[in-house]
Amino acid sequence: MEKSYITKDCQLFTVNQMKLWPQKKWKQIVLVVVLALIVVFVAFATFAGLLLSGAISREVVSEIDVLNPDGDKTALVVYQPGFSSFPNDVSYAFADGLASSGWRVEITTASSEAPSDLSKYSLLTLAYPVYGGTVGTAIVKYVDRISDFDGVNTVIIACGGGDSGESIIPLKQQVEAANGTFYDSLALSNSNSTALESARQAGSSITP
């Protein structure tokens, strides 16, 4: 289709009107497929973003499990669950290691119900999932609720799908700002088949 225009000097010229919709059938099919893929990608990205936001920020209330009730000193393990059971499995493996070395271990999830008075604990362990290099909000909020760590030795465990070590730094600074003593840290990947054994050995290496 053409449109005609008259210039200031009364000259007539025509310009082909561009059409966004292709005329050939195969081009129409290709365009439809591309548009459909874009819509699916945007929808998936939005859904994944909502899921990720929920996993990072959600708090899960749970009972306090006690391992080795007759241990010499008491250690508290607080962890934030993730999409998979990996943070849970790592936390319990570490707690098992502590119990095997003589600790009485209390383990629970990061929530408003988790102990915030650390006066009876000689060791605190904070474990959390890492998504996009971000520390889980629930574990950060839990640390915020502790007004004074009273110098308690603190272990930080980052659980991710890759290198999650960088996420430890801001949480370490947060603990130290609240009068906590940074003791050690672990960055474990769920792609490592020996991750749980590494967590267990790390726990067993800490004596009461």
Q: What function would you assign to each model-found segment?
A:
Residues 3-4:
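Polybasic, lysine-rich low-complexity intrinsically disordered segments
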Residues 10-108, 117-128, 132-208:
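FMN-binding flavodoxin-like domain, especially the glycine-rich phosphate-binding loop
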Residues 112-114:
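Short acidic active-site motifs
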